[in-house]
From Swiss-Prot:
Family assignment from sequence similarity: Belongs to the glycosyl hydrolase 3 family. NagZ subfamily.
Site (Important for catalytic activity): D179
Function: Plays a role in peptidoglycan recycling by cleaving the terminal beta-1,4-linked N-acetylglucosamine (GlcNAc) from peptide-linked peptidoglycan fragments, giving rise to free GlcNAc, anhydro-N-acetylmuramic acid and anhydro-N-acetylmuramic acid-linked peptides.
The protein's name in its UniProt record: Beta-hexosaminidase
EC numbers, comma separated: 3.2.1.52
Keywords from the named record: Cell cycle, Cell division, Cell shape, Cell wall biogenesis/degradation, Cytoplasm, Glycosidase, Hydrolase, Peptidoglycan synthesis
UniProt keyword annotation of Metal-binding present: no
Location(s), subcellular: Cytoplasm
NCBIfam families, alphabetized: PRK05337.1
Length: 348
């Protein structure tokens, strides 16, 4: 059985029989984990092993493990700083900030890989305009070139541990106050304004080999009436054609309020896939997931399947015990632990 275009979640720290049946459906291609699915590194490793064993090829396992307030796995994992802290260090010592970003990416990826998680939806490429409460300190910086530099460094760290990077939220979520989890979000700027600011990190990352992008549930009416994740203009014309992106496109969660304007969960999935998403996420709504599995008819193209498969990366580290014997990891984790929330590194 090949993979499908849906990424779903599960209820708890162990698979239930309902989870197993749901994840065995041919439309499913991935699982996203949350804090409720985590108790310890050993438990997580057992859970991911069971998920991977359900199917061949195995389901893709993802998580939002960015650092700061968006870090699903905490106890037993290195505490990662908010990305804004790296931006603040960059204002004083760019070389040090780039080094720490790479180290943070390595630690993040190495720990997840050691527990069987394939990828994290990171880095955040949104600019810190000081407008968005939902983005806030998740963003590296206000200046697009600084964001691009730090994100490229973090991606290098991820890749050195065998993990692909996913840039989000295309084409930029930082300039609006609205939280797409709970309301419709509209960015009234022109394409020219977005291109000369928000698209710079995406363009730089694409040129550097970015593997995945997550689209924003934000409407940019000067460009298209549909939000980016439902817009073929954004995903196919601008992202694929103009920016030359050849990697995997993920939707943001189709259960968010900003996505509900597009009809039933099945209609939302259809429109996102038709617009150009390779894989769509449905989170925190088991009834919607079951409805979708019973009603969606979608032929997963060979091209989309290949792009999803490329998100697996490599499993070079097989356990936390092995990881904690590696000098490179110990050094990187030590450096990251010495960064405090005020953006001060003891090595500065």
């Amino acid at each position: 059985m090949s993979l499908g275009p849906l990424m779903l979640d599960i209820a708890g720290t162990e698979l239930t029989e309902t989870d197993r049946v749901r994840l065995s459906h041919p439309l499913v291609g991935g699982v996203i984990l949350f804090a409720r699915n985590y108790a310890s590194p050993a438990q997580l490793a057992g859970l991911t092993a069971e998920i991977h064993a359900l199917r061949y090829p195995s389901l893709l396992i993802a998580v939002d493990q960015e650092g700061g307030r968006v870090q699903r796995f905490r106890d037993g994992f290195a505490r990662l700083p908010p990305m804004r802290v790296l931006g603040e260090i960059c204002d004083r010592n760019p070389d040090r900030a780039h080094h720490l970003a790479s180290q943070a990416g390595y630690v993040l990826a190495a720990e997840l890989k050691a527990c069987g998680v394939d990828l994290s939806f990171t880095p955040v490429l949104d600019l810190d305009y000081g407008q968005s409460c939902v983005i806030g300190d998740r963003a590296f910086h206000r200046e697009p070139q600084v964001v691009a530099d730090l994100a490229c460094a973090l991606m290098n760290g991820l890749q050195s541990a065998g993990m692909a990077a996913v840039g989000k939220h295309f084409p930029g979520h930082g300039a609006i106050r609205a939280d797409t989890h709970v309301e419709t979000a509209i960015d009234t700027r022109s394409y020219t304004d977005i291109e000369k600011e928000d698209l710079i990190p995406f363009r730089r990352m694409i040129d550097a080999g970015l593997s995945g992008i997550m689209a924003a549930h934000v409407i940019y009416p000067a460009i298209d009436q549909h939000s980016a994740g439902f817009s073929s203009r954004w995903l196919q014309r601008i992202l694929r054609h103009d920016l030359g992106f050849e990697g995997c496109i993920f939707s943001d969660d189709l259960g968010m309020q900003a996505a509900r304007n597009y009809g039933s969960i099945t209609r939302r999935a259809e429109q996102a896939l038709q617009a150009g998403c390779d894989m769509v996420l449905v989170c925190n709504d088991a009834d919607a997931a079951d409805e979708l599995l019973g009603s969606l008819h979608w032929e997963f193209s060979a091209a989309s399947l290949a792009r999803v498969e490329c998100m697996r990366g490599q499993h070079m580290i097989h356990s936390m015990a092995q990881l904690h014997e590696m000098e490179r990891f110990l050094q990187a984790a030590d450096e990251i632990s010495k960064i405090d929330p005020a953006g001060i590194s003891v090595s500065l």
